[in-house]
């Protein structure tokens, strides 16, 4: 005989809907939403809807774990396996926070040092290329231009003319 029973009854948001199961003496754990996309208030990000990356890292500020995987920008925020896994595994934690939190996205699953090395190598190999045409492995052009814009780096600048300050902002 089983000592535990798991009933995955998605779409039953009210505890009263579990009365039949509770009448059997089974303890009901309050359900919380899971497997949802993240709405992002940063409207400039919405301009990137449709942009996808293969191996992003998603981290909720204050939550101990981060999750990697494909990520896509939508009209309202971000979605994809990395986001859905984060929302599933942090579901109770997010519920306690009333679903308001800051999410950090590393668009490529590389350390800061690895990113610096890759960008330096790209600059050394292509000093005459405009920085907007340089990019990073795994970063779509529209996303790269967005990153440059957020770093206030002119997209028409030749990569060899990038100042240390501009490099660090990227």
Predicted features, each with a name:
Residues 1-12, 20-22, 71-76:
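Short hydrophobic core segments
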Residues 13-14, 36:
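Surface-exposed, flexible loop/turn segments at secondary-structure boundaries
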Residues 17:
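Rossmann-like NAD(P)(H) cofactor-binding subdomain of soluble oxidoreductases
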Residues 7-8, 59-170:
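Residue-level recognition of phosphate/Mg2+-coordinating polar/acidic sites
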